[in-house]
Amino acid sequence: MRYLLSAPSQIKATIQLPASKSISNRALIIHALSKGDDVPSNLSDCDDTQVMIKALTEGNEVIDILAAGTAMRFLTAYLSSTPGIHTITGTERMQQRPIQILVNALRELGAHIEYVRNEGFPPLRIEGRELTGSEITLKGNVSSQYISALLMIGPVLKNGLQLRLTGEIVSRPYINLTLQLMKDFGASASWTSDQNIQVDPQPYHCLPFTVESDWSAASYWYQIAALSPQADIELTGLFRHSYQGDSRGAEVFARLGVATEYTETGIRLKKNGTCVERLDEDFVDIPDLAQTFVVTCALLNVPFRFTGLQSLKIKETDRIEALKTEMKKLGYILHDKNDSILSWDGERVEQQTCPVIKTYEDHRMAMAFAPAAIHYPTIQIDEPQVVSKSYPGYWDDLRKAGFGIKVGEE
């Protein structure tokens, strides 16, 4: 299926954003480890979170997390520290995503994990048990989800956890998000130096908890505001002082012409009348916003150089290659370097007359390219249903904002 999109001449809308996927998934694991009754409220309705809920509540011996990478990593650590024998698997793409770094770390703590098929990749057979190890050293540039997975089980380890990170630490805000949520549930977990984290063997407390709205989802509305001639967009459920690292996107979008006003219910986006001539930005802490800013900058004719993108190659797809391929359809030639830098210097080619954007089973490809309809009235998005992974109501919300969406021709 494809969606053919058309955009209104001006955007005026109030949008209730989905709950944060990042917070929901962490809160669910911590709640399960607390063994309490107060289930977190306002959980995300996205695929990833629903997969997590099913895995934690049904207790099946074989757990299929489909395409949910967060669930694969968090559940691998959770199941390793919880009595029981389980096999955890996923889609074909999930079985191609490496997990050896996390498995090796868990084995150092005493976990019993076997690879069912290919060494270093899911599916995994996990025999949960009490883990007695307490010291782990990891490179700081590994996925922050590996680090978060280990941190969250720290309080239930017999001797707690001392985690040392070497070299550059990527996605530090996601690590801080995990630590803050752990503290909210009564854990003693903190940085003891710039590279070391200490988690004491202190049980979680089950407490009432409400999940805030998703700043990652907000980024697509910032993008729409930046690309639209006129925009007045209210987004509810967002906080000025958010746990989410992606809230930094507001600062970056301010340089691309979008002003943020904080209100009692959330935020209001308007044009601020200014836009930089070039954007150089390090995305090491906000990798999930990279696709949004690539499309936005190019369509605003703002050359850019984005660094810190090393984690993009192991996401739902190789996002660097996907961006280069799909942006070329719109007439933009991007260049990458060292698997971590993506740039556009203004180089153009003839655009396709009716571009069809391939989404590669990646929700963020669909949502980052859909706002391009403001500049490309014939654009089509392939496999639009992929947005259910993080923002199931995305297309309905676009309709509320005045976008035309109809099923395109295959």
UniProtKB/Swiss-Prot annotation:
Catalytic residues as annotated in Swiss-Prot or TrEMBL: 288 (proton acceptor)
Enzyme Commission number(s) from the entry: 2.5.1.19
A GO BP entry: aromatic amino acid family biosynthetic process
Alphabetical UniProt keywords: Amino-acid biosynthesis, Aromatic amino acid biosynthesis, Cytoplasm, Transferase
InterPro entries: Enolpyruvate_Tfrase_dom, Enolpyruvate_Tfrase_sf, EPSP_synthase, EPSP_synthase_CS, RNA3'P_cycl/enolpyr_Trfase_a/b
Subcellular location, record wording: Cytoplasm
UniProt xrefs under SUPFAM superfamilies: EPT/RTPC-like
Protein origin, superkingdom: Bacteria
S-S bonds: none
Positions that bind phosphoenolpyruvate: 21, 69, 97, 145, 319, 364, 389
Protein residues bound to 3-phosphoshikimate: 21-22, 26, 143-145, 171, 288, 315
Catalysed conversion reaction: 3-phosphoshikimate + phosphoenolpyruvate = 5-O-(1-carboxyvinyl)-3-phosphoshikimate + phosphate
Protein name per Swiss-Prot or TrEMBL: 3-phosphoshikimate 1-carboxyvinyltransferase
Species: Bacteroides fragilis (strain ATCC 25285 / DSM 2151 / CCUG 4856 / JCM 11019 / LMG 10263 / NCTC 9343 / Onslow / VPI 2553 / EN-2)
Primary gene name: aroA
